[in-house]
Amino acid sequence: MGTHDGIRYMTSEQEWEQVLQIKTAGRDDSRSDTEHHPYEPTDYCVLERLANSGHIRKKNTLIDYGSGKGRVSIFMAYQTGCHSIGIEYDERLYEKALINGESPATRNRVSFVLGDAALYELPD
């Protein structure tokens, strides 16, 4: 682990995957086309900075469009205490997100929706 400005940061993707008890690593472009990008998880260092920015708090609900295997939703719920809804159109990635969402790190604050993000209606 490293520190910057007094904030603790993990040093590797593998460390975060172990802490969160999830499997989200690796690129998957098997279902990409002109309308859909490949699955490529957001780096944990980017998520650490976002979580520590103060923009997302416990009282917030994060909507993760194109949630893939659920890394952003799970990480942000773990780090900030927010609720998170991941929306994914690829059924294979959605199924993996559901498995990852069972992580004790989420404390039932994460849910996933299978569907087109453009058609998703935001909750009140």
For each feature predicted by the language model, list its residue ranges.
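Short conserved loop adjoining the S-adenosyl-L-methionine
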Residues: 119-123
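Conserved SAM-binding loop
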Residues: 97-98
